[in-house]
Amino acid sequence: MMALMQSLVALSIDAMLPALTEIGQDLGARAANDSQLIVSFLFLGLAFGQGVYGPLSDTTGRKPAVYLGFTLFLVGSLLSLLATDLNVMLGGRFLQGLGLAAPRCVIVAIVRDQYEGPAMARVMSFVMTIFIFVPAIAPTLGQGILLIAHWRAIFATLLGCGLLTLAWFALRLPETLSVERRIPFSLARIKAAVIEVCSHRVSLGYTISLGLISSAFLGYLSSAQQIFQKQYQLGTMFPLYFAILALCIGSASFVNGRLVMRFGMQNLSRWSKRFSTVISLLFFLYVLSTGGQPPLWTMMGYMMIILFCFGIMYGNLNAMAMEPLGHIAGIGAAVMGALSTLISVPCGILIGHSYNGTVIPVISGFMISGVLIVVVMHWVETVPSEPVSETD
């Protein structure tokens, strides 16, 4: 159930990808790259929303916060469905993101209510394993809808999925935050919690690392349709190639769930970040030698490796960043999510809008983010701070 709720984020993003060009043309986008904003504005809504639902869920309980989020998501889906110009569409997408921030943020707190340390990383990895199968099939779903109906039918599908998921959540998931553990809403408490999160090296460092990973990934997502459908001329085969890459993240999350109890979160993250950074540096040099037009098989091979490494790191970085924040799990998850998304959205938009008919902007994004992650994680791991507990 939690994976399905998280998957609405992926479905709302990836089902759009095959339709971006058509939506942009129908709604009067002035430039081809402007269609990427349909993806980016959802992430922008996520960034703002996560700062609200964490404190709200600490005060009212987890379920009421999710109910509010789903209501906004459904309104945004309806607005996007009826949009007649790009500005209205972007407003609807922002509302969708604002609403989807609830399950994205609160579900981390729900898991933290019940687990911690490597056990939390293991649960999050299994959630991610199921969650990632949606990105694998979402572009195929979107492409299939386009073959038989208008792109607006994609938003009608999202509306239906939102209603079904909300009903399942309401009926099946019990409240995980007991009344005695709830904290009265207070701006002073929120400010204090933000200061605590941002002043704790472990939480801040791993949250920044999450933002850097998401920056490169958002840049890839925004330009994936243009790269595969236009540059490599895959046409309707684009969803298949996208699915293969999405499954690399899912398989990494599954593998991480199996290995994290044995090797520990820090070791797996350290190995993955080092390997992915070296590969990115080498592939960037190779891409330059091809004029930004590497053969498809080399591009796919590189992306499979990078996304597998990102899949290993993502669940572990989430768990390590949350480790010191158990006493403020709701607002802690909110600040983490908001900060990482506020880092990733502008950087991801910059990477996507830099698309120039070559893969150089996307590969540059992966390379630069990899180098910065190495620097940030080195800072976290070498400067004395409260240790992250884990079982090696």
Regions found by a protein language model. Name each.
Residues A47-N87:
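Conserved MFS/SLC helix-loop-helix module at the cytosolic interface between two early adjacent transmembrane helices
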Residues P64-L78, L159, L268-F283:
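Structural signature of the two symmetry-related core transmembrane helices
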Residues V88, G117-P118, R122-L171, L177:
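Helix-loop-helix hairpin linking two adjacent transmembrane segments in secondary transporters
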Residues G92-F133:
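Cytoplasmic helix-loop-helix junction between adjacent transmembrane helices
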Residues P174-Y206:
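Juxtamembrane intracellular "pre-TM" segments in multi-pass secondary transporters
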